[in-house]
């Protein structure tokens, strides 16, 4: 409730930023909150990841410390959706649609994967549709300066090769070129 004291306190502790979640609306009051949060975190040189928020609408142009915005039906939804989207197809739509608006906190990187016919929503042991390689590719395809790992630490410890790959992927790129793609079918992206 006292945003300035919270930001000051955590900045003094050496914390580098916040991931704020569960805003889940886009009315004027919430928009004002997001601007206050961006302004206050900038004042204390803190990064800001606005999860559970509408797609970006320019806030990060005024406050570059606001580095991520969810604004997407992220991978976490696979834990509880009774009628999940066709996730594989969805993931090759969002780079063409949502990604155009700016950085996206999608929370990819699932290590438990299943073919569409074997997939089921499970809150206690979440999984994703498709392959693990597809999950890894999302770290390159999706623009996200502050990537999250969606799975449990023990799953990444068991899959060290995947963890090493994710750790080596830059989060900021000098150039991005979509070489080819078809909405809902595939995307080929080159970054350097």
Segments (PLM) and residue ranges:
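Long hydrophobic segments that form regular secondary structure
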Residues: 116-142, 147, 182-184, 191-192
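Aromatic- and carboxylate-enriched substrate-binding clefts and catalytic-loop regions
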Residues: 1-127, 131
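Generic hydrophobic, helix-prone segments enriched in Leu/Val/Ile
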Residues: 96-97, 137, 173
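Generic structural hydrophobic/aromatic packing signal, biased to beta-strands
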Residues: 41, 66-69, 106, 138-141, ...
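A generic structural micro-environment signature
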Residues: 73, 110-112, 117, 142, ...
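Glycan-recognition and catalytic regions of carbohydrate-active enzymes
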Residues: 151-192
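Alpha-helix initiation and N-capping motif
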Residues: 103, 134-135, 159-163
């Amino acid at each position: 409730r006292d945003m300035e004291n919270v930001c000051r306190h955590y900045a003094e502790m050496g914390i580098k930023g916040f991931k704020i979640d569960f805003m889940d609306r886009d009315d004027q009051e919430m928009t004002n909150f997001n601007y206050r949060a961006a302004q206050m975190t900038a004042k204390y040189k803190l990064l800001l990841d606005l999860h559970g928020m509408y797609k970006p609408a320019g806030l990060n142009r005024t406050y570059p410390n606001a580095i991520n915005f969810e604004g997407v039906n992220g991978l976490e939804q696979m834990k509880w959706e009774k009628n999940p989207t066709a996730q594989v197809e969805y993931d090759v739509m969002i780079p063409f649609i949502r990604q155009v608006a700016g950085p996206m906190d999608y929370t990819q990187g699932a290590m438990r994967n299943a073919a569409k016919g074997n997939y089921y929503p499970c809150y206690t042991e979440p999984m994703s549709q498709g392959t693990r390689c597809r999950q890894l590719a999302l770290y390159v395809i999706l623009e996200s300066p502050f990537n999250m790992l969606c799975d449990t630490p023990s799953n990444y410890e068991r899959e060290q090769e995947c963890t090493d790959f994710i750790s080596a992927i830059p989060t900021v790129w000098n150039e991005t070129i979509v070489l080819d793609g078809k909405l809902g079918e595939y995307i080929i992206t080159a970054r350097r």
